Amino acid sequence: MIPPSKSAGESTPIDSIRWDSSWPKWVKSPERNQLLGFLQERFGIPQSIFTNQHLLKRGATVWLLTRDERLSGLASLSVETVGVPILRWVGERLKPTSAALQLFGKYVTKNIVSLEPIQLAELIGKREIRGEYPVSPGYVQIMTESIIIGCGLYLPGRLISQFPRHMFANQTWEYQGISRLE
């Protein structure tokens, strides 16, 4: 964990390891407000639930890490990733990760696509299905019954899976007797 007062090129608290510019950086206001504002505007997730969380950024990915003083002892470690990836910049747009929607999905109040199990199986198999849904174009939370599956991209008439490739790869997926096509 990088202390908020440090930046790339500065010494660590024990002065034996130099910070590397590729390590995650703390996200501070106003960028933090922009990132959390996106989640609130697009999905209705209140910013207040992130009060006890740090945001870190490395490349195009934003990571979430719980604030915990016990982690300060790890400050001297070389860090490649930390916490849970919650957002990614895709070009000029923010995309929530499926992990973020699974973790905070209970707070999502808008842009939710609820699929029947057979539709979900088709989306997993084909990566895209046709249909109109009562959401605005853009990233959406996909669920079936009460299970949050992850992120999708809704374009008028099309729902495109944004699930991580490994999420259903090399698995026989079965949900209430509906098998995934291999």
Language-model features and meaning:
Residues 2-182:
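Polybasic, low-complexity RNA-engagement segments
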